Amino acid sequence: LVLAHDDMYFCPEWDAVFFNELQNLPENSDFFLSGTMVQPFESYINLDCGKTIDEFDEEKLLKNLPQIKFNDFQGTHWQPSLIPIKTWNKVGGFSEEFSPGLGSDPDFNFKLWNLGVRLFKGLSDCRVYHFSSLSLRKKAWNNGAKTFLLKWGLSIKFFKKHYLRSDKNFDGLLLEPVKNFSYFFDLLKNKFSFFYHKFLNSF
């Protein structure tokens, strides 16, 4: 099952990269693979080829993309992503409380983590150009970060840093979070934030 946003342009060979990676995975395993987003602002791969479809410079993108080096990484850029349909069904897909979409990707990933998935791998050569949530801008934004915090007791940032090790170079299956000073300090901040939103900010 391939998941993607409706404001993404899929770059050449994206599907071949996914397919080749699948050949290296054990049959019937649960996993989460993601591609790499190219965006017109400072982020993962920064290359400004237009912020709207009317401004889109496809020629510039296709000319410059092969020259940009990027490593496979831990965690995920959320979408585009590839997962087994059986894995999607095990966790019930996206959670409706995050509609219209903000926060749904990290929530989905945390459900996969709780299922036991430990292969969260970002593929550097599976690339999409992302115009950055044009569809969501037309809708009311939900507070996905707050919803995630109240649901799981952790922030999205904490999950990405200590669980997914997001944006670190890929070096194999993820392990349980390293419970060092940074972990407990960030966890304490999470608990204060949870208490505030759960009990104080509700009045």
Give the ranges of each region predicted by the language model.
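Active-site donor/metal-binding and catalytic loop motifs
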Residues: V38, S99, K121-K139, T147
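Non-catalytic, C-terminal membrane-associated alpha-helical segments of glycosyltransferases
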Residues: A140-N143, L150, H162-F203
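Short beta-strand-to-loop element that shapes/binds the nucleotide-sugar donor at the catalytic cleft/hinge
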Residues: F31-G50
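Short, flexible, basic/aromatic active-site loop/helix in glycosyltransferases
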Residues: G50-Q74, W78
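Short beta-strand-to-loop acidic/aromatic patch adjacent to the donor-nucleotide binding site
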Residues: L1-C11
